[in-house]
Regions:
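Catalytic-core helical/loop segments in enzymes performing group transfer/polymerization on anionic/lipid-linked
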Residues: 1-541
Length: 541
């Protein structure tokens, strides 16, 4: 059972990562850059997470390996086949118009761009990303719409019928456009691919040439066309809804940038607001960097005081107002959770040692943490390990995929309880990149970060040095178990209190009044914002 990277697994080093970020930004910011280029997801380096980096490993190889050859030569052929298949589907099945409920003929005050990740989210009163804010604004007399990017297999009609009678308009984007529109998208992507191929011939540094060559192939990827498709529909909808403000989730993805550009093409005076909803990691990149004016937000709404500070420290964002807005990821107290976060939470006064194991929404991260904890469970039968999954992953699918995890020991439990209930019965939290550790610390658990050899840290608590454990092997985990909780890394009671305080500022409750003020002030600011933006060619979306 592996608890460290296999020999054939290759990591990108930190210097390589920084070089990659710089090169991709150079391509995106080039004078000949187009909206199609900005739509290439591969050029937007999100962060240093192992789940994001494998697709970049091949470009750092000294010799052209099989993976790079596949990406540059075989992949375009596959993508062209997918394009023909999608084009054929548009001929035999009519693409529906937007199925809209409760649409107003008057201009809207605010339009949210959100996501439907799971069928269970359909019909819920509160939005997964924006919580009760859309409803609160509607109750205060503002006209509100939510545009959904649909990640489920449910039809737009069935999704929107679930909200029939709601005071908030809901619109689901189509996954396909008409035959002419799909053909036009592919033609534009192909033209950008050709431009990048031509650009490659004029470049000298070998790494930059490889990145441009890969970008030329990525221009024809389905992810690029999906981003362009989203932008095309956003442009149409914004022209119809005519909102004062557009609010989108913001993590640094390409579709967020082209959505802003598309909205501004339809309404140059619209105010674009970005909601930073995910944790920021040490080397998180694309959310912290500036592109040309059409693609940048006018405001950034931070999920907490910590992320506001981290974003304000980004040199390229100094011209953008950054305000604390809040997050839906607030721990909901239950009877099993300690109500007042204090340093005494770290004391172990329960007779049962339960360790909560919380991976991210990523298969490889589930494998890493669960396989590691399985080894620990074999060595430490007195410790109970509570395996918890992201809501979008099931144990049935996980165990079907990874047979090694079927050999569980009696001291491993597959949890079907809420996060709050699991936190309330555990004393330890084994984690890697998940922000659930923030709620765990607030609930009194001792955080234990699993660091894999050869990789950059993905610890969301990277700014904190004391009050947590860092382990690399099951042996180190066992040694940690024998360490009194009041001597964590030499931390004092004050250090542990500061960790709890840090986590209390990581996410804060959402304050709809922050956004309401932006909406109310939008008419006065619109003319000034339009004039201040650098005059650039409009987006073709």
């Amino acid at each position: 059972m592996k608890t460290s990277p296999s020999p054939e697994h290759k990591f990108i080093t930190e210097p390589q990562y920084l070089e990659l970020c710089k090169a991709c930004d150079q391509i995106l910011r080039a004078q000949d850059s187009t909206a199609e280029r900005v739509a290439i997801s591969w050029l937007h380096v999100i962060r240093e997470h192992p789940a994001f980096l494998p697709k970049y490993v091949a470009i750092f190889e000294s010799r052209q390996n099989l993976q790079l050859f596949f990406q540059l030569k075989a992949r375009p052929v596959i993508n062209y086949g997918k394009f023909l298949f999608r084009l054929g589907k548009t001929l035999i099945s009519r693409v529906p118009n937007f199925h809209v409920l409760n649409i107003s003929s008057k201009p809207y005050d605010v339009v949210f761009v959100s996501h439907l990740l799971n069928r269970s989210h359909i019909g819920r009163l509160n939005d997964f990303y924006f919580g009760e804010v859309p409803n609160e604004l509607a109750m205060r007399g503002l006209s509100v719409a939510i545009i959904f990017i649909n990640h489920t297999e449910a039809s737009a009609r069935s999704i929107q019928d679930a909200w029939r009678g709601s005071s908030v308009t809901r619109i689901v984007l189509n996954k396909s456009l008409s035959f002419p529109a799909e053909f036009a998208l592919h033609q534009r992507a192909a033209q950008e691919s050709q431009r990048l191929t031509t650009l490659r011939k004029s470049l000298m540094p070998a790494l930059l040439r490889r990145i441009v060559a890969r970008s030329a192939a990525e221009a024809l990827e389905s992810s690029t066309l999906t981003n362009m498709r989203i932008a095309s529909q956003i442009r149409t909808l914004i022209a119809h809804l005519r909102p004062k403000v557009v609010v989108s989730t913001h993590e640094g993805h390409a579709f967020e940038r082209v959505a802003f550009a598309a909205a501004r093409e339809s309404m140059p005076e619209v105010c674009c607001v970005a909601h930073q909803h995910s944790a920021l990691f040490r080397l998180q990149h694309s959310i912290r960097r500036n592109l040309s004016a059409p693609y940048n937000p006018d405001f950034i709404l931070a999920s907490g005081v910590i992320s506001q500070s981290q974003l304000k420290n980004a040199p390229e964002l100094r011209h953008i107002p950054i305000m604390v807005f809040g997050s839906t990821r607030i721990l909901k107290p239950t009877g099993g959770i300690k109500q007042t976060p204090t340093a005494s939470m770290f004391a172990t006064h329960k007779s049962k040692n339960n360790c909560l194991v919380v991976p991210e929404y990523d298969w490889s991260e589930c494998d890493t943490l669960f396989e590691f904890s399985l080894e620990c469970a074999l060595a430490l039968p007195n410790i109970n390990f509570v395996w918890r999954l992201h809501p979008l992953i099931s144990f049935k699918s996980l165990l079907k995929r990874n047979r090694r995890l079927r050999a569980r020991t009696p001291n491993i439990e597959l949890s079907d309880r809420t996060l709050e209930e699991d936190i309330g019965r555990c004393q330890l939290a084994l984690y890697r990149g998940t922000t659930a550790v923030v709620q765990a610390v607030m609930g009194g658990l001792t955080p234990i970060y699993l660091q894999m050899r050869g990789e950059m840290t993905i610890d969301p608590l990277y700014e904190i040095e004391k009050g947590k454990f860092i382990v690399r092997t099951p042996k180190e985990f066992a040694e940690m178990i024998g360490t009194p909780r009041d001597t964590i890394n030499g931390a004092t009671e004050q250090d542990r209190a500061e960790l709890v305080d840090y986590c209390s500022r990581f996410y804060v409750p959402m304050d709809f009044q922050v956004l309401e003020k932006i909406i109310r002030d939008a008419p006065e600011r619109a003319q000034a914002n339009t004039a201040e933006r650098n005059p650039e060619p409009p987006s073709p979306f």
